[in-house]
From Swiss-Prot:
Gene: metAS
Marked site: Important for substrate specificity: S192
Binding-site residues for substrate, renumbered to this chain: K163, S192, R249
Keywords, comma-separated and alphabetical: Acyltransferase, Amino-acid biosynthesis, Cytoplasm, Methionine biosynthesis, Transferase
Species assigned in the record: Photobacterium profundum (strain SS9)
Annotated protein name in UniProt: Homoserine O-succinyltransferase
Residues annotated as site: Important for acyl-CoA specificity: G111
Active site (catalytic residues): C142 (acyl-thioester intermediate), H235 (proton acceptor), E237
NCBIfam families to which the protein is assigned, alphabetical: metA
HAMAP family according to UniProt: MetA_acyltransf (MF_00295)
Keyword Translocase appears in the UniProt entry: no
Pfam families registered for this protein in UniProt: HTS
Top-level EC class: transferase
Record carries keyword Transcription: no
Biological function: Transfers a succinyl group from succinyl-CoA to L-homoserine, forming succinyl-L-homoserine.
Amino acid sequence: MPIKIPDRLPATDILRSENIFVMSEARAATQGIRPLKVLLLNLMPKKIETETQFLRLLSNSPLQVDVELLRIDNRPTKNTPTEHLDTFYRQFEMVKDRNFDGLIVTGAPLGLVQFEDVLYWEEIQVIMNWAKEHVTSTMFVCWAAQAGLKLLYDLPKRTRKEKISGVYEHKIHDRHHPLLRGFDDLFKAPHSRYADFSPSYLAEHTDLDILATSEVAGVYLASTKDKRNVFVTGHPEYEVDTLHHEYIRDCEQGIEPNMPVNYYPDNNASNTPVASWRSHGHLLFSNWLNYCVYQQTPYDLDDFSEANFTKNDE
């Protein structure tokens, strides 16, 4: 089934060129199907690039998904045209009285910024608290995972001395968990962060199901037992050249970053990277939509209630 996105969104032509079924709003209105309502809170500076990456992953599902784009505030951004934001993005005041099947909160380039110093930290808290009463399942990605752990478990910000950047191997810890269905025992995923997600620390201070970890990068995937909050510390949405562009950007800014590991053939930045994480990225989002969202959400979103959710997969 397709994803339904706003007409004229730049991602439409990109996704269609990749043979991804994108449905127009007009056509979707004629189908007798209740699509899943998913809200994408895009915190990244390059919003068009990021929205396209996430829409690509949301498209690989037999479920029809109606995606709405959300911005954190109305501050102008130098990386995304104001016209694009005004045309395709909603502000929180426009959606706060509605319920949604799913919410995705993207990462943000705030790895070394303390939570209280984030310009929109108050808005983030409001939206995450709102989601408890209005969203069936929320996925927190990278920086958002750290923010979610702070707000849900009051975990302090933990950072590494050096940024983790590259493609890391992970192992799964519960092959029967719905989010891991179809996963290989070992799989790869990109990381680009300063945040530290120690498996032992999360196990000691939370009741999360720790589902996948890396010896180097730490926890990659974790979930609350009711599957209403899913934490992804890496970037399964990244395109093959995203880490490359970040590396070149940091070099040009004089940061002297370490080269992304397990990324460039022969560890040579002049060689074209090869993506080794796409299949598991698509599978993760498909499993989230199916098992955390579709199988738990009410048919009528007006019937949203805590009673709809179970603690364990049946």
